[in-house]
Amino acid sequence: MDDLHGSNARMHIREAQDPMHVQFEHHALHHIHNGSGMVDDQADDGNAGGMSEGVETDIPSHPGNVTDNRGEVVDRGSEQGDQLTLSFQGQVYVFDSVLPEKVQAVLLLLGGRELPQAAPPGLGSPHQNNRVSSLPGTPQRFSIPQRLASLVRFREKRKGRNFDKKIRYTVRKEVALRMQRNKGQFTSAKSNNDEAASAGSSWGSNQTWAIESSEAQHQEISCRHCGIGEKSTPMMRRGPAGPRTLCNACGLMWANKGAFRDLSKASPQTAQNLPLNKNEDANLETDHQIMITVANDISNSQ
């Protein structure tokens, strides 16, 4: 059994329900060394000439092993610290003048937890960090500055991505609002101008065609080769002078052979066309007889 180091070191033992309890308090300087897991109550409170060094406690990584409940105290010099209370298997261990670096090392060794209060920038020396990381059962975790730096980088990157998305959406929205629509669909200004011009030109062409058709109705078209009117032929056909310039017979001859038909051989067709103009010829003969009768009457009266 190891004795207590320092006259100001003391240890309180009380029954507790929790299997493991760690309490970090502000108190006077006290030190303890327990090597076999048993409690030694020998403490000299009246002796002021004792040791007041800091305490470093190594706690086993497997608290379930009762036979391995040992603590080791290492004196690190007289530095101002705080009180640490450990409650394990119904026994409470109180350590005074414990540095925050040592508490941080113990918490990291047990479960990777961090101190609830913000640690100073220079938390822990490189030698102590190496010693804690080399202990068996220590979880491999990133250090606090590395984790904070990675979180800051991630948040900045996410903020940039969100900002870019918002900017792109805003620009597309403004462009969409400025664009013209036709029945809900986007239409460009050029297409609208083309449609208006085509509508105007089609309206003008329709008017021109209507005027030409009305004039054509007043003037009867005749074949430019044989002189037959458009009413005497089934349809007018295209010729060398343009559309509707030849009658049906002349147009077919021109389209098939590229030459005009011989009018001297067209007497049967002329005879066939006579019944069509029978009424016109009768009217012409009647008018001619009337004119002859009127002329004879005038000559007799003189």
From Swiss-Prot:
Superkingdom: Eukaryota
Biological-process GO terms, alphabetical: regulation of DNA-templated transcription
UniProt xrefs under CDD domains: ZnF_GATA (cd00202)
Keywords: Activator, DNA-binding, Metal-binding, Nucleus, Transcription, Transcription regulation, Zinc, Zinc-finger
Subcellular location: Nucleus
InterPro entries: CCT_domain (IPR010402), TIFY-like (IPR045280), Tify_dom (IPR010399), Znf_GATA (IPR000679), Znf_NHR/GATA (IPR013088)
GO MF annotations in UniProt: identical protein binding; transcription cis-regulatory region binding; zinc ion binding
Domain Tify: 77-112
Region (Disordered), start-end ranges: 47-66, 119-141
Gene Ontology cellular component list: nucleus
Ranges where the CCT domain occurs: 147-189
Its job: Transcriptional activator that specifically binds 5'-GATA-3' or 5'-GAT-3' motifs within gene promoters.
PANTHER family reported in the protein's UniProt record: GATA TRANSCRIPTION FACTOR 28
Family of this protein: Belongs to the type IV zinc-finger family. Class C subfamily.
Protein's name according to its UniProt entry: GATA transcription factor 28
Lineage: Eukaryota, Viridiplantae, Streptophyta, Embryophyta, Tracheophyta
